[in-house]
Regions:
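N-terminal secretory signal peptides and thylakoid transit peptides that target proteins
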Residues: 1-14
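C-terminal segment of N-terminal export signals and the immediately downstream linker at the start
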Residues: 22-59
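Histidine-centered metal-chelating micro-motifs
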Residues: 113-115, 132-135, 151-152, 156-164, ...
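Ligand-binding loop in jelly-roll beta-barrel domains
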Residues: 155-185, 273-297
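Glycine- and acidic-residue-biased ligand/ion/polar-headgroup-sensing regions
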Residues: 120-136, 147-150, 238-259
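Short acidic-glycine-tyrosine-enriched beta hairpin
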Residues: 139-154, 260-277
Length: 297
């Protein structure tokens, strides 16, 4: 996709316009945004992308995205780091990792937020890291998500929602993740779960899966997410759930070694064509594992 086409798709769908918590009115900031991110044709390989940068290294079955190679968008009220192309950050070689389309590391200023905006046919996951966000949507949900929670929306046939930092004196930090679904035009739904953070101490805590009866929230995709908080020297083996899936590791804090590759804070590592990975914390570390299909159904 050419940049002009990418931007042309970009007037509504990401919700990157400011709204204050006092008036709750959208304030235009003339930012180009995506209107829609369409799923590739049936059974078309999605594969991986990497940015052509000296600090992004691609090897036989891995791709390393260093933290300082991410897109950097500072709008004043919102400071966002984009692992993959998003809004004004466009790199044709860094569009997705399999069905993982968006990984944004966001900071929202006190009293500000994302005004009401639409989505369709996307699985949208939010993981708060610090502070509280108030969520409102067209399904009638009004709730607050905070550190320790995980939120999921299946946009399906279409939803509108907003997210606001109701705190007047501190920012909110959270991860915003989009995953292409394996079913289109499903009935929209909302899910939220408070996790026991002690369940990830020196072990992998499953927080998302394809199965509504499994641990964590669920989505319309054969994907599994795990969070972990490892002390220095802790090691584990992650075994893939599905053959043909890839694993994207986003390191939130500290230093990790994954199959001999070191990643630092806010680095991302994608790996595929393998059955298991060895993960070792070189320092105290917190990280997110995202196992996702590398091809679309």
């Amino acid at each position: 996709m050419e940049r002009k086409d990418f931007i042309r798709k970009g007037l509504l769908g990401t919700g990157i316009f400011a709204a204050s918590t006092t008036g709750l009115q959208a304030l235009s900031n003339n930012i180009d945004e995506l209107k829609r991110l369409e799923l590739l044709t049936d059974k078309e390989p999605i594969g991986y992308n990497h940015i052509p940068h000296t600090k992004s290294t691609i090897m036989e079955n891995t791709v390393l995205h260093k933290a300082d190679t991410r897109g950097d968008a500072n709008h004043g009220w919102l400071h966002s780091k984009h692992t993959f192309s998003f809004a004004n950050y466009y790199n044709p070689d860094r569009m997705h990792f399999g069905v993982l389309r968006v990984l944004n590391d966001d900071i929202v200023a006190a009293g500000m937020g994302f005004g009401t905006h639409p989505h369709d046919n996307m699985e949208i996951i939010s993981i708060p890291l610090e502070g509280d966000l108030e969520h409102r949507d067209s399904m009638g949900n009004v709730t607050v998500i905070k550190n320790g929670d995980i939120q999921v929306m299946s946009a399906g046939t279409g939803i509108h929602h907003s997210e606001y930092n109701k705190n007047k004196d501190k920012p909110v930090k959270f991860l915003q993740i989009w995953v292409f679904p394996n079913k289109k035009n499903v009935t929209p739904r909302y899910g939220q779960l408070t996790l026991n953070v002690q369940d990830r101490k020196n072990k992998l805590q499953q927080v998302l899966s394809p199965n509504m009866d499994d641990e964590g929230v669920w989505i319309h995709q054969d994907a599994w997410f795990h969070l972990a908080d490892f002390d220095k020297g802790t090691s584990t083996v992650y075994r893939f759930k599905n053959k043909g899936n890839g694993l994207y590791v986003f390191n939130l804090k500290g230093d990790l070694t994954i199959n001999g590759i070191t990643i630092n804070s806010r680095d991302g590592l994608g790996i595929w064509d393998i059955e298991e990975v060895q993960i070792t914390a070189e320092t105290g570390s917190e990280f997110l594992l995202m196992e996702v299909p590398m091809t679309a159904k």
